[in-house]
Amino acid sequence: MAGASELGTGPGAAGGDGDDSLYPIAVLIDELRNEDVQLRLNSIKKLSTIALALGVERTRSELLPFLTDTIYDEDEVLLALAEQLGNFTGLVGGPDFAHCLLPPLENLATVEETVVRDKAVESLRQISQEHTPVALEAYFVPLVKRLASGDWFTSRTSACGLFSVCYPRASNAVKAEIRQQFRSLCSDDTPMVRRAAASKLGEFAKVLELDSVKSEIVPLFTSLASDEQDSVRLLAVEACVSIAQLLSQDDLETLVMPTLRQAAEDKSWRVRYMVADRFSELQKAMGPKITLNDLIPAFQNLLKDCEAEVRAAAAHKVKELGENLPIEDRETIIMNQILPYIKELVSDTNQHVKSALASVIMGLSTILGKENTIEHLLPLFLAQLKDECPDVRLNIISNLDCVNEVIGIRQLSQSLLPAIVELAEDAKWRVRLAIIEYMPLLAGQLGVEFFDEKLNSLCMAWLVDHVYAIREAATNNLMKLVQKFGTEWAQNTIVPKVLVMANDPNYLHRMTTLFCINALSEACGQEITTKQMLPIVLKMAGDQVANVRFNVAKSLQKIGPILDTNALQGEVKPVLQKLGQDEDMDVKYFAQEAISVLALA
């Protein structure tokens, strides 16, 4: 092949004419061989530009062989190359020549770095669709066979991801060979290969004929689900969902359920975790009869598993389990078969388990209805609101809207208050931040009187929190509250308290007044802004701290559009002009920007 630098200098390189566009192509081609990895990477990312300039023939005859040999490069470069080649069919002459892209991608599918291999497989899957059935058997299937029988496990793992894309369009004889190769990879000596095969088992099952699913895929599933490596067994659980969707109820009971039962009681917690994590999908795939007879007992065991991770994963699925049950049986099954286990989990020793349950338990209220919620769930909610773990309390509060729809929030309000206050004052600022974000929702559900009496002071306290993110969130919170409760409420309750902070000795608190005014002005409208807020902002223009003064300029720019012309010309303009002459550069800059934006020059 021509040297990389020679590639760019022929007349075909940039479409002839020897114009300026030829130069960058020559540079890009040179960079493909540069010692600097960043330059090689840059060139690979522009590979389509090079190919376009070279034309389809030179791309096929020169560029692709060159790229096939660059296999010993940095992983980052190889990753970019694997990605580029997936979209290269048009640049080599269209689908008739798609097979030309296979050699470099085959090489990339065998490298050591997993990310590169995965990207090469992704591109090969893409290109397989562009092969005609004849080309698929002539070029693509042999590639899959070579990878599947490669000496290195890396090539065999890559092959696993390619069976499902070439199987549907292959002839019957070739299909039999493909199935045979997949079977052998499922019993490969190397666990990594069996893992790759297990991860693609469900996907492969979907493209097989039903008879082959029963006669070949199910035995493979059974074998992988009892593999000596738990990392293989847990992937077989994932495949179970896809396989179950393809079989009849009778077949499921005889062919799949014994293996799934075994997985739900596996000695490795990671396999049991996978059953819990995929429970909703398994439930849908298996259908109501098997769910009732087999899956519910398995779920009960997962809820009382000795491993906290498993209990947490199962707890997460409680609400979905209920929603997926037949409507006529939901209430009875949850009340009799699931609720006793939930009651135990409320006082679990592990906070992740309690937190997982708290994030979904409120959703059961819509399934169980008003009476059951008040009698059975309410005591659990109240216990969780008093839990020592902030995440548990937070998860209950953040899902209050579910309960509000069923029983109304008043039932909870007395227990809710201490929990909210504690979270609002929690030492961790992220916990405080989370509760602020739920405040507008809570306010809407609790009503204005309850809010003013119990929660208003908290909202004001957040405005002077020592963490900026909290002060900022508290400001946005006020705006949302005004949108919920109206301008009259703002005028009487919020605005006076905000304006008092303008005289606070701490300049950060004085600045918070300005941030609040920025947020509230739009929600409060012209009259309140002009009469109550503007005078305070103008007065603060004389503040001793430059940070406050330039924030005055920014505030005037923000509230300017809400004010009428008289206020702008008579009050705002003189103050901005004065700030525009300030000794501080930032104050001067923001004042002049405000004058310009408000067209007051």
UniProtKB/Swiss-Prot annotation:
The modification N-acetylalanine is found at A2. PROSITE patterns: HEAT_REPEAT (PS50077). Keywords: Acetylation, Repeat. Changing V545A: In a colon adenocarcinoma. InterPro entries: ARM-like (IPR011989), ARM-type_fold (IPR016024), HEAT (IPR000357), HEAT_type_2 (IPR021133), PP2A/SF3B1-like_HEAT (IPR054573), PP2A_Regulatory_Subunit_A (IPR051023). It comes from the Eukaryota. GO terms for cellular component: cytoplasm; cytosol; extracellular exosome; membrane raft; nucleus; protein phosphatase type 2A complex. Transmembrane segments: none annotated. GO terms for biological process: apoptotic process involved in morphogenesis; meiotic sister chromatid cohesion, centromeric; positive regulation of extrinsic apoptotic signaling pathway in absence of ligand; spindle assembly. Changing G15A: In a colorectal cancer patient. HEAT repeats lie at residues 20-58, 59-96, 97-135, 136-173, 174-212, 213-251, 252-290, 291-333, 334-372, 373-411, 412-450, 451-489, 490-528, 529-567, 568-601. The PR65 subunit of protein phosphatase 2A serves as a scaffolding molecule to coordinate the assembly of the catalytic subunit and a variable regulatory B subunit. Belongs to the phosphatase 2A regulatory subunit A family. This is Serine/threonine-protein phosphatase 2A 65 kDa regulatory subunit A beta isoform. It comes from Homo sapiens. The gene is PPP2R1B.
